[in-house]
Amino acid sequence: RKATAIALASVMAMSLAACGKQDGSNQGGQTEQKEYVYVPEYLELDDNTNSSYSNMTVQGDKLYYTNYQWDEASGESKVVIGAYSLTDGSREDLPITINADGGGIYSMQADAEGNIYTAEFEWNATEGDDAYTQQTTVLHKYDASGTELMAQDITDIMQQDENNSYVGSMCLDDQGRFYISSDSLIRLFGSDGQFQGAVQTDSQWIQGMGKAKDGKVYLAYYDQSGNVKLSQIDFDGKALGQTYDNFPNTNGNGGLCAGIDNDLLVNTDTALYDYSLADQKTTEILSWL
């Protein structure tokens, strides 16, 4: 059996009660302020298959993820989409399975109704060639029962710029619109998957993208001077909005999501941070080391 540990995208707050003060009051009769520390919570997954997990995203009280499975006996592989309940710890595989022999999922998101959104790829081998020579990229939307609600081939759009022809990450706003990042370009698609335009970032490298507590989508990137910046993506204006400073370097992890106390949670190789847009201030919540 293979044990795989997943660090949950959420963190657990643990109260540090004052020594001998179970009622929460101090000797002066004043209510004592409790202190909190955040610690990572881990989920142990035992599998009988050769599996790897990715594309973890939290929506409501569920953690969604993709599970790449390889069957050693048959030599076949597939991608299964799973969900873990943050309230009762139950797990389920959704009725959505992607054939991973020559394809897979670039990125995945979920909405409050349990719909699943994916950017999927497939390599098509040209007859006589040993290697896969052509790639298709398709946006999909599935409901919780596994029914496909939308499929939009965006291959031609992605191939218009050979320097930005891949899906780095995908994000959804509160209107179900798609934001797809590549090396230095953000492509925008409506909720129906139709291309709406692109945002040129003039960036050396896009670090990550995520929806903040305000429901808007933000982009972390290196500017031309090599400094890490954060900007809101203006979908309607097809441009970057206000720029924010003092943003932590995610080292390409792309780990941005809605914050708890402030606007954004930011994950890096070594720590988890809380970021305030109003103060442009970064606070370390916990260390992964």
Which stretches of residues belong to each language-model region?
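C-terminal motif of bacterial Sec signal peptides marking the signal peptidase cleavage site
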Residues: 15-18
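Bacterial signal peptide processing site
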Residues: 20-22
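Beta-strand-rich domains and repeat architectures in extracellular enzymes and scaffolds
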Residues: 43-79
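Repeated scaffold domains used in trafficking and secretory/extracellular systems
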Residues: 50-58, 101-112, 160-173, 203-212, ...
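Residue position within the beta-strands of beta-propeller blades
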Residues: 65-66, 118-120, 180, 219-220, ...
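Short, solvent-exposed loop/turn segments at conserved positions within beta-propeller repeat blades
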Residues: 72-78, 125-135, 181, 222-227
